[in-house]
């Protein structure tokens, strides 16, 4: 992926402002509520039968925080995201058997939560474009093992 300096700045400056313990759980909860078929990968999380159960599930929140924390690897390796996520791609493909489209769905929910948090004056269209490009690079890297 080729990054412009403006894209790098938009991505890294927003990353410094993100509270991963806020955005991560929000995005994961939304994913599991809006896209309930994704719940099959989280059977060990306990009760996911209702939106209220998902909203109050500590394991969902913790996994959302873990996922957001994992984005730091991509931030630190923007010029080689595919290799930075090689082992995670293998794990999600060969061990967990996650549908790679779920990565894209979660990226959409992360973007939505960021837009809601920062608002249109701070999460401008240009910032959104950079973040979507970044998250698509991450999802592509995670799906790499599937190809």
From Swiss-Prot:
Residues binding heme b, per UniProt: 63, 92
Domain Globin: 2-147
GO CC terms: blood microparticle; haptoglobin-hemoglobin complex; hemoglobin complex
Keyword NAD: no
InterPro entries reported in the protein's UniProt record: Globin, Globin-like_sf, Globin/Proto, Hemoglobin_b, Hemoglobin_oxygen_transport
Pfam family, any one: Globin
GO-annotated biological processes: hydrogen peroxide catabolic process
Gene Ontology molecular-function annotations: haptoglobin binding; heme binding; metal ion binding; organic acid binding; oxygen binding; oxygen carrier activity; peroxidase activity
Position of the signal peptide: none
Subunit structure, interactors included: Heterotetramer of two alpha chains and two beta chains.
Function: Involved in oxygen transport from gills to the various peripheral tissues.
Family listed: Belongs to the globin family.
Protein name: Hemoglobin anodic subunit beta
Primary gene name: hbb1
């Amino acid at each position: 992926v080729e990054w412009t300096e403006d894209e790098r700045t938009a991505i890294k400056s927003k990353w410094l402002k993100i509270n991963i313990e806020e955005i991560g759980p929000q995005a994961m909860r939304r994913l599991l509520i809006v896209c309930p078929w994704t719940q099959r990968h989280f059977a060990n999380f306990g009760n996911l039968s209702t939106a209220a159960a998902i909203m109050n599930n500590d394991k969902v929140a913790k996994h959302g925080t873990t996922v957001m924390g994992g984005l730091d690897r991509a931030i630190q390796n923007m010029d080689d995201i595919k290799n930075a996520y090689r082992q995670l791609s293998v794990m999600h493909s060969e061990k967990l058997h996650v549908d790679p489209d779920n990565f894209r769905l979660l990226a959409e929910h992360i973007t939505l939560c960021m837009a809601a948090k920062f608002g249109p004056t701070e999460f401008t269209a240009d910032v959104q474009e950079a973040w979507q490009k970044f998250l698509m690079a991450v999802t592509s890297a995670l799906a790499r093992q599937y190809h």
